[in-house]
Amino acid sequence: MLSYVVRRLLEMIPVLLVVSLLVFAFIKLLPGDPARVYAGEDAPIEAIQAARVQLGLDKPLPQQYFHWLNGLAHGDMGITYRTRQPVTEVIAKSFMPTLWLALAGFAWSVVLGLLVGVVSALKRGKWQDWTLMSLAIGGISVPPFWLGLLLIQFVAMPFGIFSVSGFNQPSDIILPAFTLGASVAAVMARFTRSAFLEVAQEDYVRTAHSKGLRARLVTWKHIMRNALIPVITMLGLQFGFLLGGSIVVERVFSWPGLGWLLIESIQTQDQPVIQGLVMLFVLEFIVINLLVDLLYAVVNPAIRLR
């Protein structure tokens, strides 16, 4: 297990290097002058030129890249052009609201998605199955921003129970978490149902039934354990989506997270923050994929990581 983890961590290095090069190149292709953004729109030419020298933008692009990469390796992402604060501190401040939002949306969507998927599979072809899968299709089809606006219009504003802006108290997370997790719950329900029905048709399941084992024991010990393996992969991907793809939901609810920070940084052309956020999103997906692989062995000890 340890050797597998070490090998996977080493494999992350070339991936991150390639991604860092692509991110750097993409940022340099964006319109606008970073030195002017740093010095201010009304700054004189001399101040803009001084800012260009201070930020190292007068150096060749390869030298700029390796300087940024060296700082990145030491946890230094530079300073923001807008507030002159360290990018690491700005991202860290916005990371926790996004993490809490992702965890809340993930928790309820996984529980509901797994439950609905299993019930639908057990009631295959019956009215319960048709009803639950119809709701799941509806959940997948509804855009998150539209669902969020509906909740604000018909739940938050008429009753005044939930806040629709910011993160000031624990209850403020309810509507954004529901909005963020709705499509995930629907996807998980359909995926769990498919995985459950596929495993239920395997020979070892029929053998277990022929031996006279109780249906509940066969369901949870033989079917569910093996059906969870592909489901775990989907869980990892969906959690990565919740962490990196909450931009729209954060915008709708004015949630002070990474998505809101990314939009602000794009609008103000704050390139160091954009670079740092993209690298963070990529790192999140890589780490989540590693954790998913490790969970395989926990769910089914017959699987060996090599």
For each of these PLM feature ranges, what is it?
Residues L17-L21, L103-A107, L147-L151:
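Hydrophobic alpha-helical transmembrane segments of multi-pass integral membrane proteins
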Residues L17, L21, G138-F145, L235-G240:
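Hydrophobic alpha-helical membrane-insertion segments
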Residues V6-L16:
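N-terminal signal-anchor/signal peptide hydrophobic helix marking the start
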Residues V23-L29, K59, N70, S134-S163, ...:
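Membrane-water interface segments at the C-terminal ends of transmembrane alpha-helices
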Residues D58-L114:
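An internal, D/E-rich "acidic patch" concept
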Residues V15-F66, Q85, A156-L175:
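Hydrophobic alpha-helical transmembrane segments of membrane transport/permease proteins
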Residues F26, L30, Y38, D42, ...:
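Hydrophobic aliphatic residues
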Residues L2-Y4, E89-Q128, P144, F167-R306:
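Alpha-helical transmembrane segments of integral membrane proteins
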